UniProtKB/Swiss-Prot annotation:
The record marks R110 as: Important to generate the dianion. Ni(2+) binds at H102, H104, E108, H146. This is Acireductone dioxygenase 2. Its EC number is 1.13.11.54, 1.13.11.53. Binds 1 Fe(2+) cation per monomer. The record marks D107 as: May play a role in transmitting local conformational changes.
Amino acid sequence: MTLLQVMAADDAARVRLRTTEEAAIAAELAAHGITFDRWPVLDDAAALSSDDLLAHYADRIAALNADGRYRHIDVARIHPDDADPQWPQTARAARTKFLDEHRHAEDEVRFFAAGRGCFYLHLGAEVLAVVCEGGDLMSVPAGTLHWFDMGERPDFIAVRFFEEADGWVGDFTGDRISAGFPTLDDLLTAP
């Protein structure tokens, strides 16, 4: 379920809004210049190769990239692999990479073809936690302070759009604000 929870930046327990209503989520994000959209999902996305997945969404990708600014479009995947004894360590390392507050020099555009992840947007006096699921497209404007949590058992497929090959590299602020907010797993289990 797509979820938006808006919290005070200085007190995560002060929740102004918690909703799963798509129109309310889109409106709240649009008020901050953040694009949110829904694309149809494929039931068998996990079975498709990255090339086949990109081919399936080619028309939507072309429309989103009509101005040609995204020169690098790829697919990121992470799935639980209990048969691999190294998987928990790999998952922890992947999750930890973007759990601290950072910004990017370009827009961070992601389409979740399957699974879920949570963007936390630090916008002035508030933090907006946006749990994205399969079908969600979100564009976080360049320079926006944020962090990302893929959960304790990361499982998602995301199409990523970059202007530059290193567009995913974060500029970390050193602020530990993220430690004071509910994790993706906490948000999903909250009443």
